[in-house]
Amino acid sequence: MNISNSQVNRLRHFVRAGLRSLFRPEPQTAVEWADANYYLPKESAYQEGRWETLPFQRAIMNAMGSDYIREVNVVKSARVGYSKMLLGVYAYFIEHKQRNTLIWLPTDGDAENFMKTHVEPTIRDIPSLLALAPWYGKKHRDNTLTMKRFTNGRGFWCLGGKAAKNYREKSVDVAGYDELAAFDDDIEQEGSPTFLGDKRIEGSVWPKSIRGSTPKVRGTCQIERAASESPHFMRFHVACPHCGEEQYLKFGDKETPFGLKWTPDDPSSVFYLCEHNACVIRQQELDFTNARYICEKTGIWTRDGILWFSSSGEEIEPPDSVTFHIWTAYSPFTTWVQIVKDWMKTKGDTGKRKTFVNTTLGETWEAKIGERPDAEVMAERKEHYSAPVPDRVAYLTAGIDSQLDRYEMRVWGWGPGEESWLIDRQIIMGRHDDEQTLLRVDEAINKTYTRRNGAEMSISRICWDTGGIDPTIVYERSKKHGLFRVIPIKGASVYGKPVASMPRKRNKNGVYLTEIGTDTAKEQIYNRFTLTPEGDEPLPGAVHFPNNPDIFDLTEAQQLTAEEQVEKWVDGRKKILWDSKKRRNEALDCFVYALAALRISISRWQLDLSALLASLQEEDGAATNKKTLADYARALSGEDE
């Protein structure tokens, strides 16, 4: 049987046509596909040309394109190329993975503009995508301002997010939300946009929800809420070019010992101060090639969004839900100099400051619940003490804050109405577990302070923080100095607890481990900072500071005012929390612990500051009194129990 060449060619044609439906391209990641195919059109890009994925974009895009990560949130600033990343990944889904996709924007107008200026030029400039769009540039039922239907059978929808009807009927594999923070919280009383939109992917074999936005006001921001519901919040860590320590870039402020720093009124002098070893880093020195995203909650990390590792370095499955944060400091599209210039323009203008926080830092704007005291004003509130222990002080307590390389202690004096005086500041440097360091802490605990009549006062009760170190170190010191004199403490995990909740019985380690309501204590202390005594008149609750730079200076004032109350989304719920913004706050913590020591004395041993002061003043005028201050201290420290 003879077969002509034309018959062979026809047979070949039909075989190829029959097998075409079985053809699948070689698998590619989203980044691989984008680097090979994606093109930035002139209509919507600062610079037209081929796409090249930047180091900080790599993991985000691959996570967006991964079949194993169902939910991706991106909390971002401006100038990081988010919309371009999103569009590149959508093109990847349509052409390479052949998925049905849908994206919502805040309004119908936003959606129409996005389709005209971003989507249509992208289809035109990517040959493999244009080959699937024979209708391009023509009036056709598969080519509308809300939908594009490609010849591979896949559809792309671009809709506004205000109307509930736009969240119905569509069945897709990928649901995306651009500028989620600008969406209504409740879509026509039917629910949140992500709740409604994610219903559209429930029937997909590979469901994907991508949410991204510049954030807005904390506590009401949709992208913040979405991020709070994700178990993983990833920040981009880069190695210091000098010491090699990893850190994510932070803007910082004048009180933080890290972040962007510059000479006043000279933005061109800007550099980054390493938070680990105070190395001076210039923008051009940073190498992001091997940088990685690390979760600030769980420690898991990834460099490329494909391979994921536990905090110990073991490879793990990709997470089901993940949030990335990225901001302008990483972007090659701007400079640190420009960031500083933008910051300087916000001085004295709350509106501009809010815009800077949202669009440059990529952070939510915090509606302050309580006003943070001015450290510089507080630093001027210095008084001359008549003696190391002022006359109206009846009782001394102390708080000890534990750090790996030091212990910090503050001694506070208390008078009637809980009027307070800062008496001493002790910073004991050295390894926290070194016996020589602890012996110097012992000396600080046993130090005495002189009243105007020459009488010596000892510290009656000390609360010592167990957090961050081996708590048995503090337990042993409690046993050494007296179980009721040195009390180990830990912070309460629940908001609104009493300042101190001392147990009636010892724990299994033989000490009275006491829970401290740090939030409650800080609220009370900050309220007291607003009280201003007139002259030397007593004022219940007033706080006094000595005119002694060894004890009180601007640094001490900054630490006492380091924290502020803000609203945050935690596990999908809005909570009011204290936040130090990474500022040093040891002085405030020590004040909290000293106040807790006072409250323990009042609740457990019925300390009466007014009665005690009256007795001490009698002692000042009557040397024949048989009871000494040491006797009072022993009684009130519980040694007579």
What role is predicted for each listed range?
Residues 114-118, 122, 265, 269-278, ...:
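Mg2+-dependent endonuclease catalytic cores in nucleic-acid-processing enzymes, primarily RNase H-like
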Residues 1-7, 94, 477-481, 593, ...:
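Interface-prone segments of viral and bacterial extracellular assemblies
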Residues 401, 462, 590:
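Hydrophobic, well-ordered secondary-structure elements that form the walls
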Residues 180-181, 403, 412, 467:
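Anionic group-transfer/hydrolysis microenvironments
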Residues 322, 326, 334-338, 358, ...:
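Extracellular low-complexity, Gly/Ser/Thr-rich intrinsically disordered linkers
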Residues 1-396, 400, 407, 439-460:
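Phosphate/NTP-binding elements of NTP-utilizing enzymes
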Residues 73-79, 604-619:
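Short alpha-helical "patches" and their helix-cap loops
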